[in-house]
């Protein structure tokens, strides 16, 4: 016996037989050990052979285990081949020689076990196996091919192992219905009907429905809705994962693929191969001196012997196919474009029933429309209908979780009962009978209410589940009716459609009526997916608030100016302009093709330009970190403009992406602050033109980043000299006229500095006026209140007098520098001195501390 004359699977079976013998504490390797090992190693092979002979593999496996258990147990010694096993292996080699095979494979061993006198042979014969049946099963398995390689078993029934029959899945009702795409399917049918180069390749963005077209074609073939030359054809979808998985040895992957190709070509045009993600074949299996998988397919594709439908994305087609012209010309392109909103709504309506039956909830039509419209507007990096289907699916899954969970009001009652029971046990120890009786009454009332509501919840849930089960039954009946219609059993079709289905629909109406009666006093279960549910999922995915506004948010938006004035003193015009832009956005009245708003804030330093942007971020998102700040002083060189969108290919930092584009991809709903824009190189403004006009920017990798939900604020100190000069005599009375004249001069300067095409795209340019002394007083109070809150976190109570406010305002008032000197004054005279006093224990931090100003000096004392 030469082990090299055995296939890899046969060698592994022999090795497993040795291990099996050792594990059972036996010495002689008997034919039953070998049969058990062959059944484990060649699972799909023995499944096929036993099925063709009409044997039950499960019962044979059990019987073999019993035979092995009966064998004598011996301790010590190495396992050896028994006389019967040697005879079996010799018979297997003879069978291989007789069949003109180069190697002994698993089917030779099964045949040898059956024809050799041994217990394993008797077991197989008792189960109904005969040599003649096994020989015909082997012939059917091999389809006229001989064993010429050591991985021969991998090539048997290659289509069953490495592909999925889409037509069979369509017959079994396991594919989702395909709605629309008639033009693309018709074009695919035309190409498939050609004599040569009859291989369509579906090219489109991810999620537009390329695979669905192949499934739609399978449905049409099953229904007979195809030209005569394509009737009764089978579509097999190649599973690349199964093809590659377990291919340990060099050339094994190619052998598997060649076996698939041989099986398809051997069917003489009856099988169409669908290869999803076909670009993975280009380069697959390629190693030193070997050709890749695509080259194995080329000859059969060119001759028209192999009909294949490919599917890939535009990027992959460009990357792999266009480089290989020989492969490209063998496929005919079919472009699959993203469907428009109306087509996507039709697709979702067609899929609705499948998702309703899966999640056991109802999906309203307005939810479908919302899924398409909201996904199209807010989820920009993905494509319809895939993103809309995902929204509908997730909203239904979320609702199903709520249906299965205990309602919130019931959960609260249950928690309240537990809390009261704990209180009652505590009061019992104090012998307070009156309180115990009061708690008992309250617990009894709550338990009665809980039982009543729980019963209603359970009844509603049962009715909803009954309705959904009946709908699943109706779907199964429709599938049976379609199958009966294909088979020509029209009596059965009539019985199902006009008898059984009508009966189920009547049952649904009855249960629906019962459910309405139960819910008359109020429903405990929400069973319908609505537009608000879809909007909520969009908000969770993107962070963009598209759900219906609560009353509290409406009030906040209506009084946005007041909220902003709590942090930004003065600058009424700027606050009004920004608040109007935010209100337009949340009311859904903004231009959907542009950002929420774009503003240039001009003014001297320290007047609140950057602070307004920070306040806005905190107010809108409850978090200042939602402010994306780009300091334009870092973009003074010509080449630095690329940092916004990312370095071009070949340059350092290409993989990192752009500072602006990456920030907005992660936080699409945010405030973008370009600080001190006059310091940036003019080329930077060219990058921002399409952001302001179209609300989009393409990064260095070709990804389109959506700016339509951002608020863009640019600040500049341009014209600050003019503002300081004109505003020296600023008073509350002449403020309006002086501001208007100054703004005109600053705008003229701005027009000379920044290009007109950039300025023309800005919504509003606002000049911030220098702060008056009265406003400085308010800022001091604001800063002192901040210090009070900061110390309160450290358990120190702080109060201040009006004299401190007056002192800090006078010391910190400088029209040239705005509010920043105030911060420095408070730091020097208040924070520094207070920290010394607290550390030196000259004031007691456990008692309230008062800050006062006496004779021009800040003093601290305990109240």
From Swiss-Prot:
One of its GO terms (molecular function) is ATP hydrolysis activity. Transmembrane segments: none annotated. ATP 2 binds at residues 603-610. GO terms for cellular component: cytoplasm. ATP 1 binds at residues 204-211. Residues 157-338 are annotated as: NBD1. Its main location: cytoplasm. Residues 339-543 are annotated as: Linker. Residues 6-71 are annotated as: Repeat 1. Residues 389-520 form a coiled coil. Keywords: ATP-binding, Chaperone, Coiled coil, Cytoplasm, Nucleotide-binding, Repeat, Stress response. Residues 3-144 form the Clp R domain. Residues 553-770 are annotated as: NBD2. GO terms for biological process: cellular response to heat; protein refolding. SMART domains: AAA, ClpB_D2-small. InterPro entries: AAA+_ATPase, ATPase_AAA_core, Chaperonin_ClpB, Clp_ATPase_C, Clp_N_dom_sf, Clp_R_dom, ClpA/B, ClpA/B_CS1. The keyword Coiled coil applies. PROSITE patterns: CLP_R (PS51903), CLPAB_1 (PS00870), CLPAB_2 (PS00871). Residues 81-144 are annotated as: Repeat 2. The Clp repeat (R) domain probably functions as a substrate-discriminating domain, recruiting aggregated proteins to the ClpB hexamer and/or stabilizing bound proteins. The NBD2 domain is responsible for oligomerization, whereas the NBD1 domain stabilizes the hexamer probably in an ATP-dependent manner. The movement of the coiled-coil domain is essential for ClpB ability to rescue proteins from an aggregated state, probably by pulling apart large aggregated proteins, which are bound between the coiled-coils motifs of adjacent ClpB subunits in the functional hexamer. Homohexamer. The oligomerization is ATP-dependent. NCBIfam families: chaperone_ClpB. Part of a stress-induced multi-chaperone system, it is involved in the recovery of the cell from heat-induced damage, in cooperation with DnaK, DnaJ and GrpE. Acts before DnaK, in the processing of protein aggregates. Protein binding stimulates the ATPase activity; ATP hydrolysis unfolds the denatured protein aggregates, which probably helps expose new hydrophobic binding sites on the surface of ClpB-bound aggregates, contributing to the solubilization and refolding of denatured protein aggregates by DnaK. This is Chaperone protein ClpB. It comes from Porphyromonas gingivalis (strain ATCC BAA-308 / W83). The gene is clpB.
